[in-house]
């Protein structure tokens, strides 16, 4: 449902957006530039996945998406603080990755969790396999096979249930928050569009 909402073909649910960042950059051996005012989990995920971090000054990304890293043929977009209709379709190419967070303080909060969306089936299949201990996905557990060493990073059933329950009223929540943002902007002379 969330992939459809943001305009992507595929979505892989993960136990946290931090782990989604970690996996999306795993063994890329590159330098990733990130805003200096950002939760430490982002830098930690970049470093522990085998990369280096360089910081730049930027506060305008807060409450919005930003390009985490651009490779030769695709980019990774960190959208932990934003979730809007057709967001992937509007801001990404089919082979890009967009990462969402379902941490309790995020727009679509849950008990925790993350998601990677893309239109690239091969990337989607890789994520589905690596988060399931490197096993191929099959509805029947006994038909799963080990493809490669992976991680236990799949989203739990409890996380998914809470997120999907909250997703049912998400648009209403965004309308209410939008009205509050409008009031603050009008009264304080701001031009903020974030609902985070």
Predicted regions and their residues:
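PLP-dependent aminotransferase-like
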Residues: 25-87
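Short alpha-helical
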Residues: 19, 40-41, 122
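Conserved beta-strand termini and adjacent loop/short-helix elements that scaffold enzyme active sites
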Residues: 14, 56-58, 193-196
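Phosphate-binding glycine-rich loop
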Residues: 1-32, 45-49
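Active-site region of PLP-dependent enzymes
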Residues: 83-85, 94-196
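Conserved residues at the C-terminal ends of beta-strands
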Residues: 14, 35, 101
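Short glycine/proline-enriched coil/turn segments at helix->beta-strand junctions
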Residues: 7-9, 25-31, 58-59, 68-74, ...
């Amino acid at each position: 449902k969330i992939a459809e909402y943001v305009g992507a073909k595929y979505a892989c649910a993960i136990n946290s957006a931090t782990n989604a960042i970690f996996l999306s950059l795993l063994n890329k051996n590159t330098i990733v530039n990130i805003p200096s005012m950002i939760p430490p989990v982002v830098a930690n995920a970049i470093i522990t996945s085998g990369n280096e971090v360089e910081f730049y000054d930027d506060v305008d990304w807060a409450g919005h998406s930003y390009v985490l890293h651009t490779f030769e043929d695709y980019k990774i977009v960190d959208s932990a603080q934003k979730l809007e209709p057709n967001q992937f379709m509007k801001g990404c190419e089919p082979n890009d990755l967009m990462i969402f967070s379902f941490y309790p303080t995020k727009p679509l909060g849950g008990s925790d969790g993350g998601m990677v969306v893309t239109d690239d089936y091969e990337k989607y299949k890789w994520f589905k396999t690596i988060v399931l201990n490197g096993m191929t996905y099959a509805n029947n557990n006994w038909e799963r096979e080990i493809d490669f060493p992976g991680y236990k990073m799949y989203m739990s059933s409890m996380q998914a249930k809470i997120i999907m329950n909250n997703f049912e009223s998400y648009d209403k929540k965004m309308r209410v928050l939008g009205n509050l943002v409008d009031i603050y902007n009008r009264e304080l002379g701001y031009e903020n569009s974030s609902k985070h």
